[in-house]
Amino acid sequence: MRAVVVTDQAVEVQDVKKPEPKPNEVLVQVRACGLNRADLMVAGGMAHGATGGAGTIVGMEFSGEVVGLGSEVKNFKEGDRVMCHGTESWADYAVADWGRTVKIPDTNMSFEQAATLPVSLYTMHNAIVTNGSLQSGETVLIQGASSGVGLMALQIAKLKGASLVIGSSTNEERRNKLAEFGADLAIDSRDTNWADQVLDATGGKGVDLIIDQLSGYVANDNLKATAIMGRIINVGRLGGFSGDFDFDLHAARRIHYIGVTFRTRSIDE
């Protein structure tokens, strides 16, 4: 089959062996692929988690039709239209574990539309709903809201009934567009008083939930901008893998600080 493969120089289309599904995997004939930040990193020769380097097939999200099933796969059959979060998807065929595979609606979603959803939708549903436990009427801040995953977060927060949705972006042009995706207030996380802006918008209380894709330089101000008994969900580290952290403020505000990733989750999870 054909696949887009990382080489020492760039990427190129090569003929490679068609994958065989493991017991917990579906084999999909790929109809459309997504393109996200991690794909660009891998295509550029960098690593994303355990993925990367010469010989790697690019691609993390895709859609298509199930053409093969592992022995442990549940709730899927050959011919199902699906979208998947997996690896090596810029190819004619790709595999994904059934826990990160979702059926596509038959009537109102194309393969192309579906291929844009897995990474952003799975990531932010897991962050906002499963771990963040956002309730109707609560307030939320999305750090890094102008990314594809961030834009999905804004929409999920609105759909779940958040009374105030704040989004951050360091790019003025992108920041000005956040309202189109559900942001009631847009802030610049490089502004030294952004946490005060959040406090002003919440009557001094702080937000109930922060979805943090930045970490690093915003860590302490996140604590300042979070309500007592609020939650911070650590999704990404675009602002740095380490930073100052005021443990006293964390304790005083009794903040629940939760890290999330799919890399250490079981198939059933």
Positions of predicted regions on the chain:
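Glycine-rich beta-strand-centered segment in the early N-terminal region that forms part
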Residues: 18-34, 46-88
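Short, well-ordered loop/turn sites that connect or cap secondary structure elements
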Residues: 76-77, 134, 226
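N-terminal Rossmann-like NAD(P) cofactor-binding module of classical short-chain dehydrogenase/reductase
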Residues: 83, 141, 187, 210-211, ...
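A structural motif shared across PLP-dependent enzymes of the aminotransferase-like
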Residues: 86-99
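Mid-domain Rossmann-like dinucleotide-binding core that forms the NAD(H)/NADP(H) cofactor-binding site
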Residues: 115-191
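NAD(P)H cofactor-binding loop motif with strongest signal on the N-terminal glycine-rich segment
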Residues: 145, 214, 237
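Short amphipathic alpha-helix with an adjacent loop that forms part of the alpha/beta core around
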Residues: 193-204
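Glycine-rich phosphate-binding loop and adjacent beta-alpha segment
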Residues: 217-269
